[in-house]
């Protein structure tokens, strides 16, 4: 069965979605409802045997790249003002088909936001490579 990484994007995606304030500005009951929904998604996926893992991510980030053979790694802390995207978390699922991964992603996108309405967050659906690509 193929595995997929479902990346939850707080902002970004192919087109703008409904703007919401950052999570730390939500009412406590909205935060609890949001995370209760996400915990329930994990429980449902465990029961179906499709759950591999999931994590929420903090907004703080550090970018790093190779600095060269005799140089330290180059790092930049963020989030950066010019960065328009923030990955808020992810689920990894092991499913029968891409269609099932899309179905799960669409459901996750309905997670409640401020006031209880759906966030309509973009979910980036990426298949996990099962083997290295072969050059022609």
Where are these regions (language model features)?
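Conserved, structured core segments of small domains
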Residues: 1-136
């Amino acid at each position: 069965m193929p595995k997929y990484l479902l990346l939850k994007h707080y902002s970004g995606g192919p087109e703008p979605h409904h703007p919401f304030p950052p999570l730390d500005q939500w009412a406590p009951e909205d935060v609890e409802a949001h995370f209760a929904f996400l915990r329930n998604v994990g429980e449902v996926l465990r029961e179906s045997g499709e759950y591999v893992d999931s994590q929420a991510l903090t907004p703080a980030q550090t970018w790093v790249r190779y600095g060269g053979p005799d140089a330290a790694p180059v790092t930049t802390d963020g989030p950066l003002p010019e960065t328009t995207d923030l990955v808020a978390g992810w689920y990894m699922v092991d499913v029968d088909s891409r269609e099932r991964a899309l179905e799960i992603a669409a459901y996750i996108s309905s997670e409640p936001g401020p006031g209880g309405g759906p966030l309509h967050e973009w979910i980036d659906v990426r298949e996990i490579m099962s083997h290295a690509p072969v050059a022609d």
